[in-house]
């Protein structure tokens, strides 16, 4: 797939078929995250790949809006170690660094036919406890990972009703040359 096609075809998937993901695909996705650039090459990221159904269920129960996660085959939690990142002028670069690596992971997943969904809305403290994440580590985001279900279920239909606009703004609206 051409890179632009990967970007265009990436969408938030919330329904997956019950099929295990091969370890080589998981390693490919994780390696794509590992190769991301970071501030001063600090590589402050850590990723927790969760396949254990009890852990997945616990994460799903941690927030009412994420109950749908209980049926996903894998969840990946993207974390940052702020002490392993850089700060300059009071700006902590760990969030940006992890987001770059996580997007590499999301796009790599799309490229090999797997679905994802960036999730930032969840109870971070509960998830940290479930996954035994050390106190200094921040959770940046998480995503389910799996083979997308072809049929549109009630969650997808509801999403289309709630989020009506999927049109992207034109380049003319977002690009400024030389000045604002």
Question: Language-model features: where?
Answer:
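Acidic, surface-exposed loops and disordered segments
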Residues: 1-180
């Amino acid at each position: 797939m051409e890179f632009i096609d990967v970007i265009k075809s990436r969408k938030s998937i919330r329904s997956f078929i019950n099929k295990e993901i091969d370890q080589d695909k998981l390693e490919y996705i994780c390696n794509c995250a590992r190769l991301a650039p970071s501030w001063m090459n600090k590589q402050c990221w850590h990723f927790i790949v969760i396949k254990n159904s009890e852990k997945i269920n616990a994460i799903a129960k941690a927030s009412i809006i994420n109950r749908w996660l209980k049926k996903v085959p894998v969840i990946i939690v993207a974390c940052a170690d702020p002490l392993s990142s850089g700060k300059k002028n009071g700006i902590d670069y760990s969030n940006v660094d992890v987001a770059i690596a996580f997007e590499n992971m999301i796009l790599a997943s799309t490229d090999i036919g797997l679905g994802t969904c960036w999730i930032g809305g969840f109870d971070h403290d509960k998830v940290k406890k479930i996954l035994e994440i050390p106190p200094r580590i921040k959770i940046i985001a998480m995503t389910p990972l799996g083979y997308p279900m072809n049929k549109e279920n009630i969650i997808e239909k509801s999403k289309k009703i709630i989020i009506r606009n999927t049109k992207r703004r034109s380049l003319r609206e977002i690009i400024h040359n030389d000045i604002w």
